């Protein structure tokens, strides 16, 4: 296992480091893309900004503050997902079931019956929803929490756009026994862009031109800054077949992919800033 905080490059040009894929490497690809545009003397009709977020994993507080003091961008992307361009993200919600310690028997029964024995798709709660664009509902991040004299259990949903979060909440409440409470700790509604609109079609065409691969827009089970920042779609950096790399030991990204990302992003910047998609 390579040290996470000191990049190591092997003889094949593969770089190992925490964040090389998610997202420090792709951020540098965006910077080099903008630098290349400047060095080539390409004129842009619109200004370009790169925002460095630091709170994407724990609540988006950075962008919430940004949006209080600045206007959102006209359009853009976050390099925090995969290729081709992602036109829709699932919703994300986290729930907490709680009760007094003396109700631990009822609490344990609920957790065992509806959460721990679930197949990961919400079937025990009657939430095994599926649609053609997003696929199946997913349940994850199950954990016991200490609430200072009360029992608590958190669990999260990654849900398709065909179900609303208030429907999820009503369904959970219908399963509760006396003495149990449930609350939605946070929710981020699904993100949905017109896959035939200018932004998605421009990024689709750019990806296809640079890579020669199919750029048909896709959906994702993940969540990115697109949840909170208007007019932003997930776009890169992972290429088809590259899965389960980020947040794991030996996170990696090939030097050639960093360069390829920079090429994709450079052409994308020029086309979006100048209102071109061809």
Annotated model-derived regions:
Residues 1-47, 52, 248-251, 255-260:
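Active-site metal-coordination/substrate-binding segment of hydrolases
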Residues 56-170:
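Midchain, well-structured core segments that form catalytic/ion-binding scaffolds
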